[in-house]
Amino acid sequence: MPGTKYVLQATLLLLVLWTAPLLGYGVLSHEELIDIAWDGEIRPALQRRFPGATDDEIKLAHAYAYGGSVIQDLGYYPFGNHEFTNLLHYVRSGDFVAWMLRDAHNINEYAFALGALSHYAADIWGHPAVNAGVAIEYPNLRARFGHSVSYEDNPEAHLKTEFSFDVVQVAKKRYISKQYHDFIGFRVSEDLLERAFEDTYGIKLDELLHFDDLTIETYRFAVSRVR
């Protein structure tokens, strides 16, 4: 099957992303993973599948990769739905990413799917580190839950710790500049998201995100403000 080859290529990319040296996985860290893997892995993967792509098309695809890298967290943003994000993180998470890769029909959708793959890889490796960080920063939670405090144990503490990791990385100037991110842009492949979500869970996206256009626009704006 043609799609199988690209899923295998994406699996190799997953291994690269899994070893990237970032501990916290807020918005900035997820985008930084795209930057780390862009020249060596993501761009070549796009060019292999779409050999005729122009430089401008590759640049636009970069913006879609940024969008895909935080799509699993869409439900946390205003007008979102936590159930959407909980599904993508805890129920058939890998299947969702696989469907994204299979359902991608053009270079922008494929870049968006690779961004979602990077998020999946980052969460597998990074969340245990964040859980340990929560226990260190919140002794009262450590006393209650032990040396690993998950998002389910205390969502607020988990999100604050993730963001704190981002702040530390910014302070140490480990991220590519805001000007570069603004130059590249930030795009969301709504059609691919809808197809992959329904293929994975058997329900339409708008059953969870009733204001999906507003949700996605708010998500795009909020992420651009964090950068």
Pin down the residues of each PLM region.
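Bacterial N-terminal signal peptides that target proteins for export
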Residues: 1-10
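Bacterial N-terminal signal peptides
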Residues: 9-18
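N-terminal, motif-rich segments that launch catalysis or mediate targeting to/interaction with membranes
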Residues: 18-111, 124-206
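Catalytic glutamate of the conserved HExxH
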Residues: 116, 120, 124
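C-terminal regulatory domains involved in ligand/effector binding and gene-expression control
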Residues: 175, 187, 205-227
